[in-house]
A protein has these predicted regions:
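Conserved beta-strand positions in the Rossmann-like core of class I SAM-dependent methyltransferases
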Residues: 4, 28, 142
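N-terminal Rossmann NAD(P)H-binding glycine-rich loop of SDR-like oxidoreductase domains
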Residues: 3-25
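NAD(P)H-binding glycine-rich loop region in Rossmannoid oxidoreductase-like domains
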Residues: 35-90, 94-97, 112, 184
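Structural motif
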Residues: 2, 63-64, 102
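Active-site-lining helix/loop region of Rossmann-like oxidoreductase modules
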Residues: 8, 151-153, 157-198
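Short, polar loop motifs at secondary-structure junctions
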Residues: 30-37, 146-148
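Glycine-/Pro-rich loop/turn segments that contact NAD(P) or position catalytic residues
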Residues: 71-161
């Protein structure tokens, strides 16, 4: 499958690109002109695009799309709106228009109750808005809501759903493995799931 990955050069995205290759897929990194593509796996395909200003055709020729991007902890609410809300929603719309069969969203624990997020409320509201837009899009979707991320590769021992401790941690390597699986696994079709590393 040809799979477009938004956020491919990030800490989770680069692991996801490798995991998709390992699954036999052809991942295509959606990158800005300024992106450091040296972090991508050898031979990775790229497609130029900016989540703050996505053009028509961004998802053309892709069987599935994964949103693993984020505006980052150091950006303000304006960039959160541009990337995590509007950018994600625009990518969802373009995926649906292009005929993609599935959209996988990297969301966050707490996106189901942003009002309880304290200083994270604005970010979590943006994630919730994008998640709800995806659910209403008509696309087959998978929404992963990991707990606090670490930069570990993980052990592929994970807990999901009601078994998750929301104060626990999730290794980025484990998150990438789940996202790669969710691209094609029927077990993930139209599911929203909490996740942690065990």
């Amino acid at each position: 499958m040809n799979i477009l990955v938004a956020g491919a050069t990030g800490k989770t995205g680069r692991r996801l690109m490798q995991a998709l290759q390992d699954h036999g897929h052809t991942p295509i990194a959606l990158v800005r002109e300024s992106s450091d593509t040296s972090v991508l796996p050898e031979g990775a395909q790229t497609r130029q695009g900016d989540l703050t200003d996505l053009q028509e055709g961004a998802c053309d020729g892709c069987d599935a799309v994964v949103f693993a991007a984020g505006s980052g902890a150091d950006t303000g609410q304006d960039m959160t709106d541009k990337v995590d809300r509007k950018g994600a929603m625009r990518l969802i719309d373009l995926a649906a228009k292009s005929g993609a069969s599935r959209f996988v969203m990297l969301s966050s624990v707490g996106a189901d109750k942003p009002e309880k997020g304290g200083e994270m409320e604005h970010y979590l509201q943006a994630k919730q808005d994008a998640d709800e837009h995806l659910k209403a899009s008509g696309l087959t979707y998978a929404i992963l809501r990991p707990v606090s991320l670490t930069d570990e590769d993980g052990t592929r021992q994970m807990l999901f759903g009601d078994d998750v401790d929301e104060t626990a941690e999730a290794a980025r390597g484990d998150v990438a493995a789940v996202l790669a699986d969710a691209v094609s696994s029927d077990a993930w079709a139209n599911k929203t799931m909490l996740m942690q590393s065990a």
